[in-house]
Amino acid sequence: MTPVHFSFTSAFILGLMGLAFYRTHLLSALLCLEGMMLSLFIALALWALQFESTGFSTAPMLLLAFSACEASAGPGLLVATARTHGTDRLQNLNLLQC
């Protein structure tokens, strides 16, 4: 494994561990998801450059579009839950009670 692959793999694993262990606030969960998506985008872009094919070049742009949608919907959900529940702590949020 090259150092480049190791750095992107470790960035994804750190984001996943942050999502699993530090789930106290919704904002920290959204930031961990954003870090995971960024490491996936860079890894997918490098993978597309390695194969030098035009068929693989659309995958990073599609992932970037989905991560932009996630990044724009996240703060809206954060504001909505803070207004309705009074907090953004994930322990107090229950989707069955909404």
From Swiss-Prot:
Highest taxon of the lineage: Eukaryota
Keyword RNA-binding set for record: no
Family label: Belongs to the complex I subunit 4L family.
Enzyme class: translocase
Transmembrane segments: 1-21, 29-49, 59-79
Catalysis performed (reactions): a ubiquinone + NADH + 5 H(+)(in) = a ubiquinol + NAD(+) + 4 H(+)(out)
Classification via Pfam families: Oxidored_q2
Single GO molecular function: NADH dehydrogenase (ubiquinone) activity
Role played: Core subunit of the mitochondrial membrane respiratory chain NADH dehydrogenase (Complex I) which catalyzes electron transfer from NADH through the respiratory chain, using ubiquinone as an electron acceptor. Part of the enzyme membrane arm which is embedded in the lipid bilayer and involved in proton translocation.
EC number: 7.1.1.2
GO cellular component: mitochondrial membrane; respiratory chain complex I
Entry membrane topology: Multi-pass membrane protein
GO biological process: ATP synthesis coupled electron transport
Source organism of the structure: Formosania lacustris (Oriental stream loach)
Primary location class: mitochondrion
Residues making up the signal peptide according to the UniProt record: none
Keyword Membrane: yes
Cellular location(s): Mitochondrion membrane
Name listed for the protein in its UniProt record: NADH-ubiquinone oxidoreductase chain 4L
Keyword terms, alphabetized: Electron transport, Membrane, Mitochondrion, NAD, Respiratory chain, Translocase, Transmembrane, Transmembrane helix, Transport, Ubiquinone
